[in-house]
Regions:
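Polyanion-binding surface elements
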Residues: 1-21, 48, 54-57
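Nucleotide phosphate-binding site architecture
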Residues: 32, 50
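Minor-groove-contacting beta-hairpin "wing" of winged helix-turn-helix DNA-binding domains
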Residues: 41-45
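DNA major-groove recognition helix of helix-turn-helix
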Residues: 26, 53
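Beta-hairpin "wing" of winged helix-turn-helix
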Residues: 34-36
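A short, structured beta-strand/loop element
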Residues: 18-20, 25, 31
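Short intrinsically disordered terminal tails
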Residues: 61-65
Length: 65
C-alpha cells in the first residue's frame, strides 16, 4: 500500500485551520500524528488526514456510528 505525505500548508488548505490550531489539536491528540521528515520539517499521511476530515463531516451531519 502506497502512502503519500502532505506538508502542513496542504493540511491547512484541506482543513481551513491555522497552523497554530493544527498544532494545538496535535498536542491534544485530536489530529493525526505528524511524521518528521527533516530537522525542522513535518508532514502528514494524506490518507489519515482525509479520513479525519471525513469523520468531522460525518459527525457534523449526525452520521457517526
Amino acid at each position: 500500500m502506497s502512502q503519500s505525505l502532505i506538508r502542513l500548508s496542504e493540511v491547512q488548505r484541506r482543513t481551513g485551520y491555522s497552523k497554530a490550531w493544527i498544532y494545538r489539536l496535535l498536542k491534544e491528540s485530536r489530529f493525526p500524528q505528524s511524521v518528521k521528515i527533516g530537522s525542522r520539517a513535518i508532514a502528514f499521511v494524506e490518507s489519515e488526514v482525509d479520513e479525519w476530515v471525513n469523520q468531522r463531516i460525518a459527525e457534523s451531519r449526525g452520521e457517526v456510528a
